[in-house]
């Protein structure tokens, strides 16, 4: 598909934080079919009216971004209401963040960017395209640092602030339709053991190696800080490695 949308980015450099790109819109009448086409320079998570769109993790996926970047296609027909808000969190990912084999940041690109468009077909035959442009609002998010190889920092007390209107930009890549399978969550694992190491560290053992992330529910006071470190093994003395 050839995009009619523009690449957009934040008027302020987001650094390693995740900014939210947001667009509110109204429907003219009853909808027959609606499709979202979307990609990013970085990684993105889309929501529509507060619900997650699709299940792809780390979209748009790994490619050589200097030559091609995949885009995803989502059927959003049943997610639409009379009044709607599309929100897309965009982070650095591989394109902008740290790349291990190159031992550098910004190996493919210097800034995050988003491109998307919604194709809406109404039951009366009318058609509409809502595309990324300068009308998108950019907001901060609780994710103040996000890096594939260096973890994530979330400040749930941080106020959500309007950064400004999106600005148009140029991304030197070819947008191509996704060629592989979706990368999605496959299972939810619970720890099989709680280990107290000789140093007094509390280690949750999940019983296997994996690619994933931790979900935790906690009680505490405003300003409390929770730090989770991950490792594959313990050292020879049984301490966290």
What positions do the PLM features span?
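Extracellular/oxidizing-compartment recognition motifs
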Residues: 1-241
